[in-house]
Amino acid sequence: MDYNWLTVKAEARPAGEKGFGSFALQPIRAGETVAGFGGWVVDRVTLAEMPVYRQHRSIQIDEDLYLVSGETPEPGDMLNHSCEPNCGLLGSQLLVARRDIAPGEELTFDYAMCDASDYDEFRCFCGTPTCREVVSGSDWRDPAIQARYAGWFSSYLVRRIAALTAH
């Protein structure tokens, strides 16, 4: 049983030093849903008790809640970070193309759109001109990132950003 969904217009395959990634097989139009995340909802304490490989295949969906994928990696798990992503979040569980994506392009999103915890800090390999080099759970606080990804953040981060800017 698959817990995640990846569009038939893409496939998961090796992505160099990033491990695996998902790549467009056909043109994908801006606004198309490309992936859906599913699995088990766990709190931070439970997530911390899980094996590291399971932690890396999770997505933060609320203040202290994480969606953890199944035991076996699935194509929908193979979505990498980029500091110049072509996809963004719709709500907390759907990934949507932010722009048209050509065949062969890797589907990516900026983990700042969903992660606000330090459980998954890592060195970035995206190689884009605006690469932050290190991705952390506090990146969403950067006003430039907030402006760049307005409308593409997870629902709970939208609430956090609104609370910050209200003061």
List each language-model region with its residue ranges.
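Conserved catalytic SET/PR domain of SAM-dependent protein methyltransferases, capturing the structural core
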Residues: 1-167
